[in-house]
Curated annotation (Swiss-Prot):
Native source species: Rhizobium meliloti (strain 1021) (Ensifer meliloti)
Protein origin, superkingdom: Bacteria
GO cellular component: plasma membrane
Topology with respect to the bilayer: Multi-pass membrane protein
CDD domains: MATE_MurJ_like
Name this protein carries in UniProt: Probable lipid II flippase MurJ
Length: 535
């Protein structure tokens, strides 16, 4: 399977999950708006969800995948199964102890670390603690699922791990639909959603567990022991946890700061949901596929192939991310209005969330590039350098957020996030170049400015069109009119971008065909080699 096809497999499944996530957030916005229960649930959910993103999309896969792949190469499937059982025993024990400790200390964690601003509102504080207590075991489910997803990715089976998250949205949509049908109040909806999150974690764990068994690996429980392999995993995973979870660390810090203002937490969450669509579809797909592919190339001593993988991944991410960033910058309010403005979500909320979303658009390329750059370190088993840069990024984020929040509120926090993201991305790239791990690639260097020009032309056209179509995009127009107008604008913008990008040489069909053929050829060789090994 070619690199592009692998990106498409993971990205397509992620796209499905994110689209259902939009439906979920639309229902939630109508039911809870940006009121106190919305703040309580979003804050409570951020705690396990932060660890979910960190483990499922960052630290665990980054550390586990290269070691698991090495075990397959050195000792075959039996060695890989033994290694996975050793890790499973330690991970399960740690998660059990962590869950118990967190459940017992949840009032302190919420009141002192996550949302100290809620202490002045006893009802909101109590709801947040209760919701978080119900949902926190979701972390254990998703951490175990992340381990199994890493195994599947190493075996080039991407679909099950990528599609599992959609079931969180399925279950929460069903919960919200039932709440609407039965006429529940906001607090009852918050309780139902919390139990729904826990149920979704169990379902997702079951899906990847079945997929691993179908792949031929049956994981048994071993008494937890710090074997050499497990120690190596922990050494790699700790700094990778900080590095891969930099966005999540920033989100937790920002939640702490935002809790001082009513509605700020929920406004950031709603904007983040929209911005996560392109970030998830492109960034997570690239990071998930690139790490095992890059590790394989480096193990084989194929430095040219490794350099080509990195360059084509950056090219691919920018080709899709730059127009998405431009669209978020220009069309933020119409997008938020269409998706969320109904029920308890007011026009004033649309303006606030729209401003935050436009700011996130400026940072989108940085966060996607981070996901493309980090595998260049992790595949070489260097997790320390990205950890240092992550620490610098956190310091930038915290200092700016504290400085800007008093005057700009939630928009100040969003600004701090994107500045920190760009600092992190630039440090990662500069270090790869300085160490000679990023070869000069003429096609990439010539295409990037052309893609920027294409995105700028598209943004200018959208700016004029949004002003000209102000009424069809306003809340005074029927929902169907707004939806058709926005979809038409997006389609026209895509046509303009692709026409300009291909027209001025930012992209070419021959480039795409070469990528597919190169990946198909590599896959054929890989399959032949695997067949010879089995014989």
């Amino acid at each position: 399977m070619s690199l592009v096809k692998k990106f498409a497999t993971v990205g397509g499944a992620t796209l499905g999950s994110r689209l259902f996530g939009f439906i979920r957030e639309t229902f939630m916005a109508a039911a809870l708006g940006t009121g106190p229960v919305a703040d309580a649930f979003n804050t409570a959910f951020r705690l396990p969800n932060t660890f979910r993103r960190l483990f499922a999309e960052g630290a665990f896969n980054s550390a586990f995948v290269p070691l698991f792949a090495k075990e397959i190469e050195a000792h075959g499937m039996d060695g890989a199964r033994r290694f996975s059982e050793e890790v499973f025993g330690v991970l399960f024990t740690v998660l059990l102890l962590l869950t118990i400790a967190m459940e017992l200390s949840m009032p302190f964690i919420v009141g002192q670390l996550i949302a100290p601003g809620f202490a002045d509102d006893p009802a909101k504080f109590t709801s947040t603690v209760t919701f978080a207590t119900i949902m926190f075991p979701y972390l254990a489910c998703m951490s175990l699922a992340a381990m199994m997803a890493g195994m599947l990715n190493s075996l080039h089976r991407y679909f099950a791990a990528a599609i599992a998250p959609v079931f969180l949205n399925f279950i929460l949509i069903a919960v919200l639909a039932y709440a609407w049908y039965s006429g529940q109040d906001a607090v009852a909806v918050g309780y139902d959603l919390s139990w729904g999150v826990l149920a979704a974690g169990l379902v997702q764990l079951a899906i990847v567990w079945v997929a691993v068994r179908n792949a031929g690996i049956r994981i048994g429980f071993r008494r937890p022991r710090l074997t050499p392999n497990v120690k190596r995993l922990l050494v790699l995973a700790l700094p990778a946890a900080i590095t891969g979870g930099i966005t999540q660390i920033n989100l937790l810090i920002n939640t702490n700061i935002a809790s001082a203002k009513e509605g700020a937490v929920s406004s950031l969450v709603y904007a983040d949901r929209i911005y996560q669509l392109p970030l998830g579809v492109v960034g997570i797909a690239v990071a998930t596929v690139l790490l095992p592919e890059l590790a394989r190339a480096l193990r084989g001593g194929n430095l040219n192939e490794a350099a080509n993988l990195q360059n084509r991944s950056v090219e691919f991410t920018l080709f899709l991310t730059l127009p998405a960033a431009a669209a978020l910058l220009v069309m933020s309010e119409p997008i938020v209005r269409l998706l969320f403005e109904r029920g308890q979500f007011s026009p004033e909320s649309t303006v606030v969330v729209g401003h935050i979303l436009a700011i996130y658009g400026l940072g989108l390329p940085a966060f996607v590039l981070i996901k493309a750059f980090i595998p260049g370190f992790f595949a070489r088993e260097d997790t320390r350098t990205p950890m240092i840069f992550a620490g610098i990024s956190v310091a930038v984020n915290v200092s700016l957020a504290l400085t800007l929040f008093p005057s700009l509120a939630a928009s100040g926090i969003a600004t701090a996030e994107i500045v920190a993201g760009w600092v992190n991305a630039l440090l990662l790239f500069a270090t790869l170049v300085w160490r000679g791990h990023w070869g000069r690639d003429i096609p990439l260097l010539t295409r990037i400015p052309r893609l920027v020009i294409a995105a700028a032309i598209m943004a200018a056209a959208l700016y004029v069109a949004v002003d000209w179509l102000a009424f069809p995009l306003s809340s005074a127009a029927p929902l169907s009119t707004r939806a058709l107008t926005l979809c038409g604008l997006i389609a026209a913008a895509m046509a303009i971008y692709f026409a300009v990008a291909f027209g001025i040489g930012g992209a070419s069909l021959s480039m795409i065909r070469r990528s597919v053929k190169r990946g198909a050829s590599a896959s054929s060789v890989e399959r032949a080699s695997e067949g010879a090994d089995r014989q």
